[in-house]
């Protein structure tokens, strides 16, 4: 019986790359694996898929196959045959297919277990707006794991040392077989460390690390804002058995301010003015983060008008120009008026009457003219 083309076996084109070949192989190997497929021809198809994969993922064998076809691997042709006498090691195949899950890129082979780097930590820091804009130094206390001083982080009592695990021979992993299946898992004897501590340190009980609250000084750069993160390298948890420590990330949150709101590099505030000043003009004192300044209020200023004070905002921690302070004027209505004051206001209002009223209250005139037109249209 003639042999099928290897590209046809895997269902890929002749221009397929190694990634596509491997993807097709995994899919077909799972489909025809004898432990999953009880059909009579499943084993033969499985062997065929395995052989095609081995040839097409070996650069030299693939080049020979592309030039000579199956003849390149027939006995006596100098190609050396397909290897393995046409048999298939289902345990190895399982490792190839699931190696990235159980054994990493090593295709299910044992890998040296290393002491793990320490975990990163996060500290939430609240700053006032002034602290965030100007920068400051803060002292913080962080509960963490540090290397044990008694054993220098080894976990073993002074004068002793850890020995190689006899179960995994220092690899940290063992292979468990169930029928055709081969699965790698952490060594149950040394818990994946590859070493056994027979005489543990009394201070850390063989862990190499102890709990401690560290006091750290954190320098906050000027211009930080909510959401910014400051990294303190090596100030996280100590690593296992002398491995590098993790990092500490200080997460910044800027508290609300009683006067200012921040948006990027700009600051916003509301400035109340009397209706008299809004009408006739004047000056009002405005606070900034660098002191007080006077803002000129033009006559006939309406409530909600914005005034920009350039360079009175924030300089970003990332550099660039300083932002602006944007002041929104709010005209206050007087309250707690005496009878005399109310009479004076009524006289002022009456002085706006007559045909010239519109020029004193342009928005009111426009509004009421619009209302009149609206009802005229409804009834017309």
Curated annotation (Swiss-Prot):
**SUPFAM superfamilies attached here?**
Chaperone J-domain, DnaJ/Hsp40 cysteine-rich domain, HSP40/DnaJ peptide-binding domain
Molecular functions per Gene Ontology: ATP binding; heat shock protein binding; unfolded protein binding; zinc ion binding
Gene Ontology CC, one term: cytoplasm
Task: Name the residues that bind Zn(2+) 2.
Answer: 165, 168, 187, 190
Q: Which residues form a coiled coil?
A: none
The record, for InterPro entries, names:
DnaJ, DnaJ_C, DnaJ_domain, DnaJ_domain_CS, HSP40/DnaJ_pept-bd, HSP_DnaJ_Cys-rich_dom, HSP_DnaJ_Cys-rich_dom_sf, J_dom_sf
- UniProt subcellular location: Cytoplasm
- Protein family membership: Belongs to the DnaJ family.
The subunit field of the Swiss-Prot or TrEMBL record says: Homodimer.
What name goes with this protein?
Answer: Chaperone protein DnaJ
Q: Which organism is it from?
A: Photobacterium profundum (strain SS9)
Corresponding gene? Answer: dnaJ
């Amino acid at each position: 019986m003639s042999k099928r083309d290897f590209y046809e076996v895997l269902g890929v084109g002749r221009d397929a790359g190694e990634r596509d070949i491997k993807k097709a192989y995994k899919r077909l190997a799972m489909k025809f694996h004898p432990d999953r497929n009880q059909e009579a021809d499943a084993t033969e198809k499985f062997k065929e898929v395995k052989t095609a994969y081995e040839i097409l993922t070996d650069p030299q064998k693939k080049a020979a196959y592309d030039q000579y076809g199956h003849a390149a691997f027939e006995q006596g042709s100098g190609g050396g045959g397909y290897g393995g006498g046409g048999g298939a090691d289902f345990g190895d195949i399982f490792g190839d297919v699931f190696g990235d899950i159980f054994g990493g890129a090593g295709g299910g082979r044992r890998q040296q277990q290393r002491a793990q780097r320490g975990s990163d930590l996060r500290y939430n820091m609240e700053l006032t707006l002034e602290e965030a804009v100007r920068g400051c130094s803060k002292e913080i206390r962080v509960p963490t794991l540090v290397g044990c001083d008694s054993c220098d982080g080894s976990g073993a009592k002074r004068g002793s040392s850890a020995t190689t695990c006899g179960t995994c021979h220092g690899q940290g992993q063992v292979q468990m077989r169930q029928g055709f299946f081969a699965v790698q898992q952490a060594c149950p004897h040394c818990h994946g460390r590859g070493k056994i501590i027979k005489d543990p340190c009394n201070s850390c009980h063989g862990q190499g690390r102890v709990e401690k609250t560290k006091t750290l000084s954190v320098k906050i750069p000027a211009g930080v804002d909510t959401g910014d993160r400051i990294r303190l390298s090596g100030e996280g948890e100590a690593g296992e058995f002398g491995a590098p420590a993790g990092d500490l990330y200080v997460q910044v949150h800027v508290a609300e301010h009683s006067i200012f709101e921040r948006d990027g590099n700009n600051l916003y505030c509301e400035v109340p003015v009397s209706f008299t000043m809004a009408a006739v003009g004047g000056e009002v004192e405005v606070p900034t983060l660098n002191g007080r300044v006077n803002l000129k209020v033009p006559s006939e200023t309406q409530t909600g008008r914005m005034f920009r004070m350039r360079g009175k905002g924030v300089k970003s921690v990332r550099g660039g120009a300083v932002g602006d302070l944007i002041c929104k004027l709010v005209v206050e209505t007087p309250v707690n008026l005496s009878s005399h004051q109310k009479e004076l206001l009524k006289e002022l209002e009456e002085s706006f009457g007559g045909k010239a009223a519109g020029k004193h209250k342009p928005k009111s005139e426009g509004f009421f003219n619009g209302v009149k037109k609206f009802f005229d249209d409804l009834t017309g």
